[in-house]
Each structure stands twice: as structure tokens, then as C-alpha cells.
Amino acid sequence: MNARPEKASSAGQADAPIRSGADYIESLRGRGLRVFLQGEFVTEPVDHPVIRPSINAVAETYDLAVRNPELATAVSPYTGERVNRFLHIAGSPGDLVMQNKMQRRLGQLTGTCFQRCVGMDAFNALHSVTWEIDAARGTGYHRRFIDFLAMAQRRNLVVGGAMTDASAPTERSAG
């Protein structure tokens, strides 16, 4: 459980949705994180020149949704509202085509990784897997997943994921 108090967004409410790239950037400030980069403590990660390009790329995912909602948003069956396509569960081949077009456009705009694809893919996988587990075992994972998804959609959060390579050399130390 996170012991830190939740930071209010620029709208002044902790649960207010992030509406733009500027809102996203502001939501990252003043979190009191202990960040070290190349052995040096970073006082405010948002302003660090090595970190900032990644932040700007994520911010563009919000701004594209504002500028081009047909491309970068979709109507959620869980909230009934338009949500960022990175938080949308693909329900048709058309959804997958639009995901690809959005990702292509973001690549053109940012020229870099925009940090949200793995989270989107994880959400889509979890949607299917939790339903299958519930069907086989009578558990409540899918409902809890849908509740979390709807909360993330309402607040327009970034959901991140990580890829690892299990075949990477393990004989070397991390240090």
C-alpha cells in the first residue's frame, strides 16, 4: 500500500482526470521521489534533461487525444465515455487498426518510445486471461480487473509495463 498521500492534479482534486500533456507533466512534479541517474541524485526528475524527453513523449499521448479524438480515443463499454486509446480494450479488428494508426502517428510526432504500449498490451491480455480464469475457477478476478480498468479510464492514468529478457546472461552482477 502506498503510504504517500495522493497528489492533487492541476484541477485541484486527487481523483480529477489528467486531461492534457501539461496536466500529466504537472502531476509528476513534487512527488518526493528518490531518483538517481548515473550515480547523481536528481532533485526534480521532471526537469532533468535526460528524463524529460520520455516525459514529453508520454505527454504527447494526452495531447494527441485532445487534438485527434477519433484517432487517439475510443468509447469505453465500462464507463460509456471516450477514453484514451491506451486504456481501451480492443473489441474488434477496427480497434486494432486504430491502435496501430495511433501508434504510428505518435512515432512520427515523438521520434521515440512513448512509454505506453506495453501497458496497453498488458491490459488487453489481462482482460482475456482474467475472464478465462473466472470461467474455469469461479474466481472474481475479472470483475476486479474491470473495476481497476474503469478507475484508470476515469482518471486517464498512464499504466506502464515492463518487458524483460529471461534469456539474458545471469552470471553478471547488476552493479
Sequence positions of predicted segments:
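Glycine-rich flavin
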Residues: 74-175
